[in-house]
Amino acid sequence: MPCPGRLLLERIDPIVDPGEVSGHVHTVSGGSGFGFNTTFEQQRDSACSSCPIKQDMSAYWTPKLYWMSEDGNSFEDVPQAGEGEGVTGGMTVYYQQRGPDPSNLTAFPEGFRMLAGDPHQRNDTGLEAAPGKAVSYVCLDYSGATSHPETGNMPDYNCPNGLRAQLYFPSCWNGVDLDSEDHRSHMAYPIGEYNNGRCPDSHPVQLISIFYEVIYQTNLFADRWWSDGQQPFVFSQGDRTGYGFHADFVNGWDVDVLQKAVDECTNDSGRLEDCPVFGELFTNDECQACRLPQSVDEELTGNLTSLPGCNPPTDGPEYATAQSCNTPEISSPTQYFTNMIQSVGWEYQGCASDDIASRTLTGGFTWSDDMTVQHCIDYCKGEGFILAGLEYANQCYCGNDYANQDAAPNPDILGNCWQPCAGNDQEVCGGSAALSVYKSCDGGACSNAVFHVNGTESTSSSSGDSSSSEKRKRHIHKHAHGHAKFH
């Protein structure tokens, strides 16, 4: 299952640190019900997912990778495959029928969650597990000019098309516990091989197997290697080796649908479309529009002087120990709109989708290299329209209704509106095929569409408070630049 979009980049881990800021940064894909406190019910209630299967609102996450200067005083986030201006990079989640009897596999039960790997591991355990052989790396060269074997750690050579990190989860369940104190003990790897084989008697229930792949664009740093030949990368928990790669999973499936797919979708093509159980899928644009705003006020991307949190880089082979320091609080999520209620009596409706072949707002149109939210509202108001939509930084569309109601803003979907306005880079003016929409209150009640994240503070929908505005200013620029198998 290719998850083309990223739901969230945040110091968040509701399995290990529920209700708290996590120790290190994670990249999250999956259902929008995700938050600092995440339950199965909240995941199932997700309005969208950055992954394509509509019956799957699970959450999948892994640590963020950074480039590190040789003197250890500078860090930069490494983009994932597919990442670019206004577009987030995702991951691939494989669902595989493995084991001695693939016809007798069980879907993840409601409320199930697990963790694989150990963020503090810094050497090779040699185990058929994670940490161990279930964690691996592939140096990508699509030209075929170079060929390297899989490694258990991050290699000390450049990969022409990036580095792929891989993790295989345990597939044997004790049949009782949906989680455990260490979030691992309720699960076990098969006997003999981490990705196949019979389950031990202690964990007799063979579940469907899942396997994560994340491609990091390490090739973008090919000319910034360390002078001694060492690779210059570090995971967000301070892991310079790669042995500490880890991953989390919170089930958000319609369990009956997953079980039906496990039983019936045996086509070896790996194409989701070849599994009729799933029916209609989310499009790539819908996956990209499914995002969550940051709720911890700290910089996670760009040029950093240290890794977020207390994560000094370590090379091992000693087991790393967790560090503690001052941690910012969870606050209200960053909001990506300008409060126009007091000034002109227009409310923010949300982020609508748009299509060049079938416009969402079909009234007036103007564009300007000095475009701002105020500029667009003034134009549409002057032309007699009650809706003003900003797109692609410098465009303004007007209307009195949405030509396509399916494209109208959904208050539960944040959307792909991240682009700084051409005339004021502290404001958001939509995005690619995405409209930041404002509506005239016409003297009536006014209320901005404020986006909420599970486990965060609420924010007044009409105040547009200054703290949210300041956070938006600090974070807006990072957003602007910035194989499923059932066999």
Residue ranges and their predicted role:
Residues Y168-P170, Q349:
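A short, local hydrophobic-aromatic micro-motif
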Residues M1-G23, T27-L167, N174-Q342:
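Primary mode marks residue(s) on the alpha4-beta5-alpha5 output face of response regulator receiver
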Residues P14-I15, G111, S171, T360, ...:
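Residue-level preference for alpha-helix termini and adjacent loops
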Residues Q323-T459, E470-H487:
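Peripheral, non-catalytic regulatory segments
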Residues Y137, S458-S461:
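Serine/threonine-rich, low-complexity intrinsically disordered segments
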Residues S463-S469:
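N-terminal, immediately post-signal peptide pro-regions of secreted/luminal proteins
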